[in-house]
């Protein structure tokens, strides 16, 4: 192994390589490899052979400009590869982001470990009455949460017991009963609950990673995937700090406003009192606009 390299490296990210970052109860994120840094974005934008200018404020200003004006290609010059362990039901949400290279642990070839996710009691809530895709904000009473957790754990343990019974093999692949024929792993796996953990390698460029983070760190995203996204956001901050600052400024803490929304703001600036009924916006649009300025 060479001890030196000519490629761009980031000391803060080098220190994170292969380190296990714990997520949820049994999950983790590990940075396996990366390519590029903030200077790579600047270099691509200027189509030069150097590392941009010698003045960091100019590089930072260019990155701000690129992100503010929705340039994409320069950010695609940076790549990062993760090793991630996550519950299957979160993996199925995650994989909807189809702009990454993924290789997942195969339960056809191997036996899944006996590890499953159980939420904290405070994270168990009823269905939201106003949003069809997420839970309500308030936790359920302690007695109800304890019952929910007991059911989730009981079902997971029972299903794993049947999983091993169907294969006639233990967690390490050893035959349980020589007189019994087990079924194929690819069939036995269908009995497992979605809170069991899977693992994958996930490689993505910075542009698409930022899109993933914008959606999955949002308060409307499911709590469990938000936890993973938050950890990855911290990694991005260490990897490309200028890009992170621009991303926070223009995406995470910024806002998109519609044409009607801009017209309402202009009317308000001119001294007009505008309410929902006179705004020309539907109820949801109006509430989203008002929320921006609260």
Swiss-Prot record:
Ligand binding (dUMP): 93-96, 104-108, 189, 216
Keyword Transcription on entry: no
Cofactor remark: Binds 4 FAD per tetramer. Each FAD binding site is formed by three monomers.
Sequence motif ThyX motif, location on chain: 96-106
InterPro entries hit by this protein: Thymidylate_synthase_ThyX, Thymidylate_synthase_ThyX_sf
Catalytic reaction annotation: dUMP + (6R)-5,10-methylene-5,6,7,8-tetrahydrofolate + NADPH + H(+) = dTMP + (6S)-5,6,7,8-tetrahydrofolate + NADP(+)
List of catalytic residues: 216 (involved in ionization of n3 of dump, leading to its activation)
UniProt keywords, alphabetically: FAD, Flavoprotein, Methyltransferase, NADP, Nucleotide biosynthesis, Transferase
EC number of this enzyme: 2.1.1.148
Biological process, per Gene Ontology: dTMP biosynthetic process; dTTP biosynthetic process; methylation
A single MF term (Gene Ontology): flavin adenine dinucleotide binding
Cofactor requirement: FAD
Pathway per the UniProt entry: Pyrimidine metabolism; dTTP biosynthesis
Protein purpose: Catalyzes the reductive methylation of 2'-deoxyuridine-5'-monophosphate (dUMP) to 2'-deoxythymidine-5'-monophosphate (dTMP) while utilizing 5,10-methylenetetrahydrofolate (mTHF) as the methyl donor, and NADPH and FADH(2) as the reductant.
Description of how the protein assembles with itself and partners: Homotetramer.
Classification via PANTHER family: FLAVIN-DEPENDENT THYMIDYLATE SYNTHASE
Family: Belongs to the thymidylate synthase ThyX family.
NCBIfam families xref list: thyX
Name listed for the protein in its UniProt record: Flavin-dependent thymidylate synthase
Source lineage: Bacteria, Pseudomonadati, Pseudomonadota, Alphaproteobacteria, Rickettsiales
């Amino acid at each position: 192994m060479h001890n030196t390299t000519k490629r761009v490296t980031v000391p803060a990210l080098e220190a994170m390589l292969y380190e296990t970052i714990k997520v949820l109860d049994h999950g983790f994120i590990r940075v396996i490899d990366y390519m590029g840094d903030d200077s790579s974005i600047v270099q691509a934008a200027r189509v030069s052979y150097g590392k941009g200018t010698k003045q960091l404020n100019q590089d930072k200003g260019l990155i701000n400009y690129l992100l503010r004006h929705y340039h994409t290609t320069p950010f695609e010059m940076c790549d990062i590869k993760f090793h991630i362990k996550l519950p299957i039901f979160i993996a199925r949400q995650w994989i909807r982001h189809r702009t990454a290279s993924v290789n997942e642990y195969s339960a056809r070839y191997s036996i899944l470990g006996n590890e499953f996710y159980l939420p904290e009691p405070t994270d168990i809530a009823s269905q939201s009455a106003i949003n069809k895709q997420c839970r309500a904000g308030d936790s359920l009473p302690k007695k109800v949460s304890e019952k929910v957790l007991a059911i989730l754990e009981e079902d997971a343990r029972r299903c794993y017991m049947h999983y091993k019974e169907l294969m006639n093999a233990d967690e390490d692949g050893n035959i349980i009963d020589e007189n019994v024929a087990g079924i194929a792993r690819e069939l036995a796996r269908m009995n497992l609950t979605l809170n069991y953990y899977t693992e994958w390698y996930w490689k993505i460029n910075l542009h698409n990673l930022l899109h993933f983070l914008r959606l999955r760190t949002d308060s409307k995203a499911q709590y469990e995937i938000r936890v993973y996204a938050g950890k990855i956001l911290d990694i991005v901050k260490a990897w490309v700090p200028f890009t992170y600052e621009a991303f926070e400024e223009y995406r995470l803490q910024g806002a998109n406003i519609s044409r009607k929304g801009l017209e309402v703001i202009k009317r308000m600036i001119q001294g007009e009192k505008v309410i929902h009924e006179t705004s020309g916006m539907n109820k949801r649009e109006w509430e989203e606009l008002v929320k921006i300025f609260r």
